[in-house]
From Swiss-Prot:
The keyword NAD applies. One of its GO terms (biological process) is photosynthesis, light reaction. This is NAD(P)H-quinone oxidoreductase subunit I, chloroplastic. PANTHER family: NAD(P)H-QUINONE OXIDOREDUCTASE SUBUNIT I, CHLOROPLASTIC. It comes from Hordeum vulgare. Binds 2 [4Fe-4S] clusters per subunit.
Amino acid sequence: MFPMVTGFMSYGQQTIRATRYIGQSFITTLSHTNRLPITIHYPYEKSITPERFRGRIHFEFDKCIACEVCVRVCPIDLPVVDWRFEKDIKRKQLLNYSIDFGVCIFCGNCVEYCPTSCLSMTEEYELSTYDRHELNYNQIALSRLPISIMGDYTIQTIRNSSESKINEEKSSNSRTITDY
């Protein structure tokens, strides 16, 4: 065939292929118009954290025996434990305990291996500050319990879509005597 005719045929095929791809993209876009939005309006709506969420670490000063297991299992040797040995009771006395959340990777090893369970993970994830030195929490700041977002009337809590689907399936699968 003539080269000009062949060029027009390939141009026509390319045009048809491009139109098909644009049409498929448009159909995909239109199929998403009826769905609920995935994103949330963050400061006013907060999602409920999962059950084993690893947030800020809570510390109980009275339970700590200053064994420093948390420092040894931490991949970055993060917790700073200051103690002194009391000769009369032959035991370590904890003086200061601090964690720098600007460096912490929230792995949870310190919580997992603590023999007295004085460390626990909370659901608090809002740790942002303007000064990174404010992220260095001492034992007083670590012992503060997080504020529950469930009781705050100014914040609307939103369940994860996977949690709501599981709860819907459980409710639909449960049968009562009258549901035969």
